[in-house]
Amino acid sequence: NKKRITEIDAQNKLEKFRKINKNYLFPSFNTIAGTGPNGAIVHYKTSKKSNKIIKKNDIFLCDSGGQYKYGTTDVTRTICFSKQQKSIRDKFTKVLKGHIAVATTNIKKYKNGKQIDARARQFLKKDGLDYAHGTGHGVGFFSNVHEGPQSISKYNTVKLEEGMVLSNEPGYYKKGYYGIRIENLVYIKKNKKKLQFENLTLAPIEKDLI
C-alpha cells in the first residue's frame, strides 16, 4: 500500500484499536508519535504544524497508554520499516540491554530506584552516552500514569516494595535525527525469598533494530 501515513494517522489508528476493547475509556496521557527527528523530542506532541509523514528510512517512536476499567497502561516501542545503519542498531541494542538489566534486577540487592537506574544506563555510558530522563516512574491504578513516591531515577532513594508498579523505559536521543525508547510496565512480585520485576507489557520489541 503506497498511501502516505503521518504521525497523526498512526496516533488515530492506535486509538481506534484501543476502542475495540470494551473496557477502554480514554488515553492515560497525550500520545507521543514521533518519526525521525521528532522522535528525539522526549515529550513530543504532534500537531498539524509539526506532523510528519512516516518515511520508510526513518525510525518511529510511539509512547502511548490507556485508562481501562481494570487499570492504567503506558508502553513505548521504537520500530523501523527498512534496514537501519549499524550505528542506530548499536544504540538500540544498548538501550535494550539496559531495559533487560532493569527487568532482571534482584530487588533484594538493588533496593531503590537510584541503584537500578545506574544498571539501565551502564551500556550507553561505556560510550559516553546517556539520556536526560528517569528510567522509570510509578504508575497508578486507573489514576495518574505518573505516580510516586517510587521511581527509577538518579536521585530516588525510596525503597521498592512488593506490589508497586513502575515503568522501565531507558532511551537514547540524537537531536535532529531520531529517538529510541523501550518501555514496559513492571510489577514487583515476591518469588519465594526474592523480590523481582514481572513484566505487565507483552507488546513485541523490534528485532530488526538489534
Where are these regions (language model features)?
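Active-site neighborhoods and metal-handling regions in enzymes and metal-associated proteins
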Residues: 1-210
